[in-house]
């Protein structure tokens, strides 16, 4: 993406009132993009932290900024990207003209980027180097919920693409709150080696605490540094969340660039 000195980038994260580390990857990606000097301004806002989405309405007061690219740092389309963010940022479609004459451009979430499969494979290789993929099962862990299955659909889509490559003995999507459950990993895998990659944007409570417990990794400390975990005669390799991958900064930049190439569809705000 070429430099856009008359444009700003707003990265929207979920944040957390419980775990301050939840926003760390989003802030880190923003810092890296800012360092590259591609935009006049790069900043973040959050649903559960400060600065809030409403605060963002008062950002970008420089008259030289004509366009604001809004990229949700979310793993999939869903309630927050289709309803909460448009409502809080007062967006009325893919493009919103402000009274200040700025144009706010609402981009697709980072998790829907076409290169997500390669990032997942990269993370899997990093966490289990020199482990033969042909003797390994790869598990992609999504949240899964009865309220909104978009995260589950997104995880399943990635799994189908990775499975089609035929690199691993098996590639499965598993979830925290719906079948197939990550807690059943021992029953649904047959290989000695099992690699687990959380399909989340940050190492929040789910990926740092909940999923390891569901897997049976109960030792304190850095779960990834302790790889492989020897459980029930298996070698279990556990990764940090995919959203902590440094190349996520490139994903966010490319989602902004993609807007001008093909405007995304935005569901009506309810």
Each predicted region: which residue ranges?
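Active-site-proximal alpha-helix that buttresses catalytic centers in soluble enzyme cores
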Residues: 1-270
